[in-house]
Amino acid sequence: PSYFDPETKMRGITLDIAKWKRPSPESAPVHAKAAGLYMICTLSKHEAEKKGFQDALMLDYRGYVAEATGANVFFIDGEGTLHTPIPDCFLNGITRRTVIKLAESLQMKVVERHIMPEDMADMNADMNCVELYCEVQ
């Protein structure tokens, strides 16, 4: 099953920027699948949907891009380099690591870095990835 219908996939999903932030590693077990952390994402997704968006982009406690509410985020720049946030306040899960390995196996340069929301304007494509769902927009 797909998270989004075919029309939405072709058009691309819209993301609101969540008002809630991913917490710092000193305040929650950010590298675990912890129920309290899911609440932040669930509330953010519901808020985004009320505003007409399909999902929300989660920023971390410093204002850097972290992830979508249920998916990792990746960006491709004009040179074909894959950029993804450093997983220092969210789970560095299997799907994320697999996407990175696949990109590297295709000889793509992968850069893990802190990404500010305004940096996204310089990217040619973005990708949201969660188990069984990974689409380039």
What are these regions (language model features)?
Residues P1-Q137:
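Helix-start/capping segments and mature chain N-termini
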